[in-house]
Amino acid sequence: MRWGSVILAALFEIGWVMGLKHADSALEWICTAAAVVMSFYILVKAGEKLPVGTVYAVFTGLGTAGTVVCEIALFNEPANIAKLALIGVLLCGVIGLKLVTNEEKGEAS
C-alpha cells in the first residue's frame, strides 16, 4: 500500500494547511507543526519506493483539492461551479498520473 502512504501524507498536509489559517491556541499550533513533520516524513518515505515526481504531484494535488473541499465544507468558503470543476480536473490529472506510473521507482511506462 505504497500509494496509501502518499494519501496519508496528503491528509496531514491538509491538516497543517488548515492549521496555518485557523490555529488560535498553543495546542493547535503544536498540532499544526506535528502535521507538517508527519506530512513530509511520510512523503519522503514514499519517495524512496515510488517515482518521486509522481509522488510529489499526487501529494500536492490531493492536498490542494482536499484543502479547498475542507474550506468549503467546514468554513463556509464560497463554492462555485468553476472552482469545483477545476478541482475535478486536478483530481483527474492526479488519478491519471497514478494510473500510468509503475509501482517501482525508476520504472517507466
Curated annotation (Swiss-Prot):
Example GO molecular function: transmembrane transporter activity
GO biological process, one term: monoatomic ion transport
Location (main, coarse): membrane
UniProt subcellular location: Cell membrane
Membrane spanning stretches: 3-23, 26-46, 55-75, 81-101
Keywords: Cell membrane, Ion transport, Membrane, Transmembrane, Transmembrane helix, Transport
Keyword Transmembrane helix: yes
Pfam family membership, one: Multi_Drug_Res
Gene3D superfamilies registered for this protein in UniProt: 1.10.3730.20
GO cellular component, one term: plasma membrane
InterPro entries documented for this protein: Small_drug/metabolite_transptr (IPR000390), Small_multidrug_res (IPR045324)
Membrane topology summary: Multi-pass membrane protein
Function: Probably involved in guanidinium transport.
Family: Belongs to the drug/metabolite transporter (DMT) superfamily. Small multidrug resistance (SMR) (TC 2.A.7.1) family. YkkC/YkkD subfamily.
Subunit structure, as described in the record: The efflux pump is composed of GdnC and GdnD.
Protein name, as recorded: Probable guanidinium efflux system subunit GdnC
Organism: Bacillus licheniformis (strain ATCC 14580 / DSM 13 / JCM 2505 / CCUG 7422 / NBRC 12200 / NCIMB 9375 / NCTC 10341 / NRRL NRS-1264 / Gibson 46)
